[in-house]
Curated annotation (Swiss-Prot):
The modification Phosphothreonine is found at residues 4, 182. Residues 1-234 are annotated as: Disordered. Residues 65-74 have a biased composition (Low complexity). This is Protein CDV3 homolog. It comes from the Eukaryota.
Amino acid sequence: MAETEERSLDNFFAKRDKKKKKERSNRAASAAGAAGSAGGSSGAAGAAGGGAGAGTRPGDGGTASAGAAGPGAATKAVTKDEDEWKELEQKEVDYSGLRVQAMQISSEKEEDDNEKRQDPGDNWEEGGGGGGGMEKSSGPWNKTAPVQAPPAPVIVTETPEPAMTSGVYRPPGARLTTTRKTPQGPPEIYSDTQFPSLQSTAKHVESRKDKEMEKSFEVVRHKNRGRDEVSKNQALKLQLDNQYAVLENQKSSHSQYN
């Protein structure tokens, strides 16, 4: 496989080289023809200035130069034709038997109309100064709407909205009661209720409630009085009997059986 690929590549490059050689030879031949035509034209000018004495020879030289100049001029014309760019012309296809022709013509007309609308300067020149402008103004997009008179202002009477009740259930007795709002003034700095302090509690005056509370509770005035009462109660509950007397009785019974 590798050998066949190499052979095909060699053949391809060999053909390419041959084409290049042919092009070079054609160029050399055209250059030689151009040089020959230039020499023939100079020889013809010299024969015309020589006189009538050399009759046949200048004529022969002239014909030879003309013959040499012929192929050179032809090669020049061929090279000029090759150098010039050829514009491709689209061939018009006959759509007479089909419906496609009508569609194509309509699309071409639409394109022309769009171009005219986009280029107002060209239409102005073609229409004699005012044709395109009239066409644009006559379009449906340039129709001016009639000016409408402003409507009379409508007077709206605001109806009082009913008071919105909250969703909280209230008994009928509580519904009629109205909360009295106390006037909120500046805070009293020197009042003990709003700004209590330790000094105000030290100067506390005894009231009737305090006296009643003192009657229900026992006020302790001595530190060791409570402890003495507890120690006396514990001393009364002491058991002075011998707890091991039962064991002595058991020992005596065992000794009797022995």
